């Protein structure tokens, strides 16, 4: 089974719980389509403090490490969030297959 990094908003507009639920739905979508989803943005903030600059940097590093190990990189929703943009750039540099989906899991062009 291929692995896929799920990139979706998490901290945007302080809607963490709503965004977490969306990320779980995106993970289910990936799983139902034959992929093993990786979404560290959902659990790393429970281990490290997102609001401390040094630990937020560690979260970003762990996310990049996860991207490096995944076969593909899927983006859901609006990537305007700064963290998502940086991760997309990193995935591009890693040569990952990148797919963009809207918030309803419809493939975008």
Walk through the language-model features, giving the residues of each.
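Catalytic phosphate/metal-binding cores of nucleic-acid and nucleotide-processing enzymes, i.e., regions
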Residues: 1-109
């Amino acid at each position: 089974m291929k692995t896929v990094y799920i990139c979706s908003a998490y901290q945007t507009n302080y809607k963490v719980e709503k965004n977490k639920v969306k990320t779980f739905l995106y993970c289910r979508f990936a799983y139902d389509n034959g992929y093993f989803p990786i979404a560290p943005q959902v659990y790393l903030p429970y281990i490290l403090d997102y609001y401390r600059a040094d630990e937020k940097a560690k979260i970003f590093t762990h996310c990049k490490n996860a991207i490096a190990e995944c076969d593909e990189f899927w983006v859901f929703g609006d990537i305007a969030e700064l963290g998502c943009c940086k991760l997309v750039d990193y995935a591009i540099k890693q040569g990952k297959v990148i797919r963009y989906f809207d918030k309803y899991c419809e493939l975008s062009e």
